[in-house]
C-alpha cells in the first residue's frame, strides 16, 4: 500500500534553512481532523521557532505555522463539531487541558499543558495539517483564505490585547509598532471605538496606520515619542506594544496617563528599565497578553466577517518560505506574508 505524501517545509535544526520536501500525510487521531491547507500566514513567532531563540524551544524536526486556513478532509473518532468540507484554521493555541484553573476560568491561553501549533505540534507550512477539533478556529463562510489567515494569530492577539487595556470607546490607545500585528491592531481599535495614536520608526508604516484610521502618528526617530504622545493626546488611556525592540516597552510607561494600562504583545529578548516611582505614582497597570482564547477567536473572526478588518497581505508560495523569513529578519515586510498552498 502506498503512503500518501504531501509537501511540507520543516525545520531540520535551529537556524537552518527550512527543508521543503515530501512527507507522509498525517492521520487524524481521536478528536482530531485532517485539513487540506489552502493558505498559511507567516508570523514572527515562526521565525523565533526556526531560530530556537526563546527560552521554551520546539524540538526539531518540526513544521512551523499557526495561521493555516483549509478544508476539513477527514475526521478522527469522536469528532462532532467540525465536518468534512468545513473551512477551519489552526492557531497557536492548538489545544489545552480543559481542566486546570486557567481553563476553567476562561484563561486557557495560560494553561501549562497547552500545545502550540507549529511549535510543540506540527503546523501549517504543509499541504495537510492536523487540528484538535475542539480548538480549531471555524472560519466564517465566504472568507478570503489569504486575507483571513493573519486573523488566526496576529488578529486574535491584538484583539485580546486591546480588550485587556480596558480602553473604552472615545478614549486614546497607543499602538506601538505598526508591523504585522500593529497594522491590524489599528483596525481593531478603530472598530472598537478607540481613538488611535500610532508609533513606529518607518514613515511608510505610519502612513499605513493613518490609512486604517489612526488620528495621530509619531515617528520615534524624528521626535521623542513620549513627549509627542503626551502633547497630542494628553497621555494615552492605554498602550498596546507590538514592537520588537525593548526601548518601546520603556517608552510606553511615559506615554500613559494616570490610571492607564500598558499591554505587552511583542516578545523581544532581554529586559527593559521600569521606573518604579512613575508606575506607583501614576497608578499604572502593566500586563502581558498572549494570543487569545477560543471565544476571543470567535469574536476576532466576527470583526473580519463584518468587513471591519482587512489585513494588508502579500501572497507567496511555499517554496518562497526561506526568502520570506530572510525578509522578516531584515524588517522588510509590510503587513503580513501569506503562503498559498492550494485553491479551494
Where are these regions (language model features)?
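C-terminal hydrophobic helical "lid"/dimerization subdomain
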Residues: 1-6, 203, 250-254, 294-344
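Glycine-rich beta-strand-centered segment in the early N-terminal region that forms part
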Residues: 26-40, 53-101, 140-143
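NAD(P)H dinucleotide-binding glycine-rich loop of Rossmann-like/cofactor-binding domains
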Residues: 95-176
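Mid-domain Rossmann-like dinucleotide-binding core that forms the NAD(H)/NADP(H) cofactor-binding site
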Residues: 141-223, 227-228
Amino acid at each position: 500500500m502506498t503512503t500518501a505524501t504531501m509537501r511540507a517545509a520543516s525545520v531540520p535544526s535551529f537556524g537552518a534553512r527550512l527543508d521543503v520536501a515530501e512527507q507522509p500525510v498525517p492521520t487524524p487521531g481521536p478528536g482530531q481532523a485532517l485539513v487540506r491547507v489552502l493558505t498559511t500566514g507567516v508570523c514572527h513567532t515562526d521565525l523565533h521557532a526556526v531560530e530556537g531563540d526563546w527560552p521554551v524551544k520546539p524540538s526539531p524536526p518540526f513544521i512551523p505555522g499557526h495561521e493555516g486556513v483549509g478544508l476539513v478532509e477527514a475526521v478522527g473518532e469522536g469528532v462532532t463539531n467540525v465536518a468534512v468540507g468545513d473551512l477551519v484554521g489552526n492557531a497557536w493555541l492548538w489545544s489545552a487541558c480543559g481542566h486546570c484553573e486557567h481553563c476553567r476560568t476562561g484563561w486557557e491561553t495560560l494553561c501549562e499543558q497547552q500545545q502550540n501549533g507549529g511549535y510543540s505540534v506540527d503546523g501549517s507550512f504543509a499541504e495537510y495539517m492536523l487540528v484538535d477539533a475542539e480548538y480549531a478556529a471555524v472560519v466564517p463562510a465566504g472568507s478570503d483564505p489569504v486575507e483571513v489567515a493573519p486573523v488566526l494569530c496576529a488578529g486574535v492577539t491584538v484583539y485580546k490585547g486591546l480588550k485587556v487595556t480596558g480602553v473604552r470607546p472615545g478614549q486614546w490607545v497607543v499602538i506601538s509598532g505598526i508591523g504585522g500585528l500593529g497594522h491590524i491592531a489599528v483596525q481593531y481599535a478603530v472598530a472598537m471605538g478607540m481613538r488611535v495614536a500610532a508609533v513606529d520608526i518607518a514613515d511608510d508604516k505610519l502612513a499605513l496606520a493613518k490609512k486604517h484610521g489612526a488620528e495621530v502618528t509619531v515617528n520615534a526617530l524624528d521626535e521623542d515619542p513620549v513627549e509627542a504622545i503626551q502633547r497630542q493626546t494628553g497621555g494615552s488611556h492605554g498602550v498596546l506594544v507590538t514592537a520588537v525592540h525593548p526601548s518601546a516597552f520603556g517608552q510606553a510607561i511615559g506615554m500613559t496617563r494616570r490610571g492607564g494600562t500598558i499591554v505587552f504583545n511583542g516578545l523581544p529578548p532581554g529586559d527593559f528599565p521600569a521606573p518604579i516611582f512613575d508606575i506607583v505614582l501614576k497608578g499604572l497597570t502593566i500586563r502581558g497578553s498572549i494570543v487569545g482564547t477560543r471565544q476571543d477567536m470567535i469574536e476576532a473572526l466576527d470583526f473580519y466577517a463584518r468587513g471591519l478588518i482587512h489585513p494588508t497581505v502579500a501572497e507567496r508560495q511555499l517554496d518562497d518560505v526561506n526568502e520570506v523569513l530572510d525578509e522578516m529578519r531584515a524588517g522588510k515586510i509590510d503587513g503580513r506574508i501569506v503562503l498559498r498552498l492550494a485553491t479551494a
